[in-house]
């Protein structure tokens, strides 16, 4: 597990109001170096030349070397021969990620989205692996062609590998799970695995043009058919740490559960309010609690969030570990927390009937659900009840007598919450909020932890209440910190590229829908109208899916460009500091706002640089966690389907590709592949622009959303693969197999 990568000067902003930062901080050194190259873009400079020209002190050479290493790692500079450094674009260099093909060649996916992918031949691919971040040089040939040469490996995408053990001529090999990575020789070790066993390995040496890579076994995990081995394999491959370092545990154990009287006296005491938490049945950490009151035609919403920043100070081992993880990871049957349990389930969790320190946002709304004003306070609360979404639904919708009696003192409070939440939602809907309303699967486990059913996850009025209140709080914090001119880590969501929507237009037209593309940018409300027009119709699910795929991913950054999906001009993440590091960053800025801190120019410059790094790091860790979560869900679905071999199910086509199409089963929300090679009645081709697969001789077509009947023919749970065979289509045509 990596630790926080920023020097003390960066976290200093959260520790004191005044700053006496010296110029010898790495973030500022990077800025000075880039400024030098901005004025001398064609130059190739050594560290010594940079020291002299940029005005560094003689004893700052090591600082320059460290800063150059970071700039090269980020692709902002490139190291050339004889220890010279230069700007990449002046050397005709392109930065990107390697995407390998099982046949040995690969492609560079440029960071610049306007560039086409670049082909990497087998010779170049010997030096790299799938996922590596590299810098390449594109050499134009006299006949109009081009050759791509790898100049520098910036970051390795593979450090740990998982696969099965095999032998050839007495020598051990790792056959990686990922088919895009070839077999890798293993160094002889003390432990010799059995053939076919799952082994975890670390790369000892990366490949060169002359020699293959080499790895060594770090753990023999067991049989590939063992469900727990399959689950642990995902945890290993994603480098997720299931334990905390001793120093982190030591700091966590020293946190006092007692709240000092002077701390309570310094805060607003909200313990008299009937504040409650509302979470899922299996939730163990509670970071938000809510309360609503109404005076006349005005509503006042209190959103109280666990004051994690009070317990996790900057520069500590706790903070560094939280930075490194950046997020908690949630699997269907387990979780890997960002903070140790002593904090996440203990003093930071808003457990019922216990005093807790919180940060509270108080928002006043008018009768239409429009925000009138908001204010921030550091507070102390005592949650009156640990409510679940199900029990709130039983109060508001089912009117369950037993539940009504149990929570009779809170019934009016829940009704008021529902009233306000629906008003807020109507305001968001009016400005163009996107609601794709795609069903989510919930995996049900038996007492032995084996998946026994997959059902549609419930979403009720209680979910709507919490969602609306959390969005309102996040917007209020973002607005107020922005108005105070404080740098902030925004949660931003860029709108879809016009090209992506133009490519989608013919398919939408085939369903009878048209998306206005007259303007350069499509407004959220236009996509919202499209979603609304398909509501309740047969094509709703496929239309929602293709539109969602055209969307970009939300990220964290200090530049505010708004949030397209929420149709919000100013948004951040504030409400989940137990499980998200960006929220902890925002909490620290919350404290600066309460103190009325003013930033000096050099403080602002360094803080913005820190927020840029924090945004990049936490966005990457979020994507990493989401990938791991998706893969674990796919594994559990494959495990569930193991006893469904040879059974037939109805479903619909969700994805088309040149090798087949994916079908999601109506009953279980499980997706599997129908390979084109299994369709023996014709030879089929994939027409990407038309969104169809079509037979060459008979013209039979498969489209997104088509209803089909399939048989389960193969399952490889270790690889989370499920293969279907087509039985018939919605028009009654059957496979001739």
Predicted regions mapped to residue ranges:
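The catalytic Nudix box helix
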Residues: 1-2, 13
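Short, low-complexity interaction segments enriched in Ser/Thr/Pro/Gly
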Residues: 2-5, 733
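A short macromolecule-binding patch
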Residues: 115-121, 181-186, 669-686
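Electropositive polyanion-binding surfaces
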Residues: 200, 205-207, 233-240, 247-681, ...
């Amino acid at each position: 597990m990596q630790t926080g990568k920023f020097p003390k000067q960066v976290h200093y902003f959260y520790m004191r109001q005044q700053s006496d930062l010296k110029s010898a901080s790495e973030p500022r050194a990077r800025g000075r170096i880039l400024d030098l190259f901005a004025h001398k873009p064609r130059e190739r400079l050594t560290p010594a030349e940079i020291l002299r020209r940029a005005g560094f002190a003689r004893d700052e050479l090591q600082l320059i070397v460290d800063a150059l290493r970071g700039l090269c790692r980020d692709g902002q500079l490139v190291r050339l021969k004889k220890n010279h450094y230069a700007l990449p674009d002046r050397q005709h260099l392109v930065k990107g990620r390697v995407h390998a093909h099982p046949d040995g060649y690969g492609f560079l996916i440029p960071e610049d989205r306007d560039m086409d992918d670049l082909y990497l031949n087998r010779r170049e691919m010997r030096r790299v692996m799938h996922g590596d971040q590299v810098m390449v040089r594109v050499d134009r040939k006299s006949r109009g062609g081009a050759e791509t040469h790898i100049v520098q490996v910036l970051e390795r995408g593979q450090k740990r590998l998982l696969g099965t053990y095999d032998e050839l001529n007495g020598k051990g090999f790792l056959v990686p799970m990922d088919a895009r990575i070839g077999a890798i020789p293993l160094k002889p070790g003390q432990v010799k695995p059995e053939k076919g066993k799952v082994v975890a390995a670390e790369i000892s040496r990366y490949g060169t043009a002359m020699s293959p890579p080499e790895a060594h076994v770090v753990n023999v995990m067991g049989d590939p058919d063992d469900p727990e081995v399959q689950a642990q394999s995902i945890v290993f491959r994603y480098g997720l740490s299931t334990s905390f370092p001793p120093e982190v545990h030591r700091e966590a154990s020293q946190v006092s559960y007692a709240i000092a009287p002077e701390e309570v006296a310094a805060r607003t005491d909200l313990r008299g309010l009937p504040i409650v938490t509302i979470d899922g049945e299996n939730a163990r950490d509670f970071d938000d609690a809510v309360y609503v009151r109404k005076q006349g035609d005005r509503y006042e919403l209190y959103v109280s969030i666990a004051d994690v920043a009070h317990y996790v100070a900057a520069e500590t081992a706790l903070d560094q570990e939280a930075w490194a993880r950046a997020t908690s990871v949630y699997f269907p049957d387990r979780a890997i927390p960002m903070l140790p349990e002593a904090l996440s389930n203990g003093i930071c969790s808003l457990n019922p009937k216990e005093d807790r320190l919180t940060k509270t946002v108080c928002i006043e709304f008018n009768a239409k659900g429009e925000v009138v004003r908001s204010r921030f306070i550091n507070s102390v609360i005592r949650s009156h009840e640990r409510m679940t979404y199900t029990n709130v639904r039983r109060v508001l919708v089912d009117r369950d007598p037993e539940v009504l009696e149990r929570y009779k003192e809170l019934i009016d409070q829940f009704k008021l919450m529902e009233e306000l939440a629906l008003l807020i939602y109507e305001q968001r809907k009016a400005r163009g909020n996107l609601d794709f309303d795609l069903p989510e699967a919930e995996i049900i486990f038996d007492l032995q932890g084996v998946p026994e059913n997959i059902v549609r996850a419930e979403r009720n009025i209680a979910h709507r209440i919490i969602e609306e209140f959390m969005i309102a709080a996040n917007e209020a914090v973002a607005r107020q910190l922005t108005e105070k001119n404080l740098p902030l880590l925004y949660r931003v969501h860029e709108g879809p590229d016009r090209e992506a929507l133009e490519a989608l237009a013919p398919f939408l037209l085939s369903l009878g829908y048209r998306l206005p593309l007259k303007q350069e940018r499509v407004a959220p409300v236009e996509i919202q109208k499209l979603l609304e027009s398909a509501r309740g119709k047969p094509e709703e699910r496929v239309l929602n899916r293709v539109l969602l795929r055209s969307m970009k991913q939300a990220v964290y950054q200090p530049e505010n460009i708004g949030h397209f999906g929420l149709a919000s001009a100013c948004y951040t993440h504030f409400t989940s500091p137990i499980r998200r590091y960006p929220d902890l960053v925002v909490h620290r800025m919350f404290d600066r706002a309460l103190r009325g801190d003013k930033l000096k120019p050099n403080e602002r410059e360094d803080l913005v640089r820190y927020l840029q790094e924090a945004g990049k790091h936490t966005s990457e860790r979020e994507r990493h966690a989401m990938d791991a979560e998706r893969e674990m869900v796919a594994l559990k679905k494959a495990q569930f389907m193991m006893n469904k071999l040879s059974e037939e199910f109805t479903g619909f086509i969700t994805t088309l590709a040149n090798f087949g199409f994916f079908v999601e089963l109506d009953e279980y929300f499980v997706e599997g592949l129908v390979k084109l090679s299994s369709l023996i009645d014709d030879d089929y081709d994939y027409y990407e622009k038309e969104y169809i697969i079509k037979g060459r001789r008979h013209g039979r077509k498969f489209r997104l959303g088509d209803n089909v009947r399939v048989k389960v023919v193969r399952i490889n749970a270790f690889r989370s693969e499920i293969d279907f065979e087509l039985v018939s289509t919605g028009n009654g045509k059957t496979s001739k197999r």
